[in-house]
Amino acid sequence: MQLKKTLIATVLVLAMGSSWAQADPARAQKIVMGSCFLCHGENGESSSEVFPKLAGQHANYIAKQLENFKTGQRKSTAMADMSSRLSPDEMLALGKYFEAKPSAPEPVEDANLAAVGSYIFHTGNTYSGVPACASCHGKEALGSANLPRLAGQYPEYIENQLKLFNQRERTNDNAVMHAIVSKMTPLEMAAVAAYVSGK
């Protein structure tokens, strides 16, 4: 029995090592400095709210978004072009590169708005049927391997993505998010964005 457990553990370690080997950090650095940094910054802290911060974002989530851009499941002319040159291993390598970078919270400009956002994020709105965002994205808005980290993201970017989900203009991951966001008011969207950006 002990030998069987040891063999299983060894296989898992080797598999993890293989995954990390495929996600070549040197290759990721080269790709970042060749193109990604122009919009997202060398360390994933983009200088404009038009472009999402990638620092601290989950590797699997980044890789999935790149794949969705490449296949056209998520629309963006610029990102479709960039991702068309990437292999799955390179996408994962970029994900791991940015996931390892520290992320800083955005300053809260409207404390009252953020307080409303905190309530919606943690409790939802029972009257309109909006569920608590924390039920999927976590109490600290850190997400999970397959769900995005929202903490520290630009509020303008988050608010815009919520609107795109509502209008079905963002077509990947749309079913669940559209069902939720379609019940939110513009104020609630802005409030949630203000709250999570400051975390």
Give the location of each predicted region:
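Periodic glycine anchor positions in long extracellular repeat architectures
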Residues: 41-44, 56, 138, 152
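Sequence context surrounding c-type heme c attachment/ligation sites in exported
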Residues: 26-37, 59, 63-64, 118-134, ...
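The canonical Cys-X-X-Cys-His
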Residues: 36-42, 94, 130-139, 192
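Axial heme c-ligation environment in periplasmic c-type cytochrome domains
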Residues: 47-53, 68-110, 144-149, 166-199
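Bacterial N-terminal signal peptides that target proteins for export
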Residues: 1-8
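Electrostatic cytochrome c docking/interface patches
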Residues: 17-32, 45-50, 100-127
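Stable alpha-helical elements in mature extracytoplasmic
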Residues: 32, 58, 65, 75-78, ...
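Bacterial N-terminal signal peptides
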Residues: 9-17
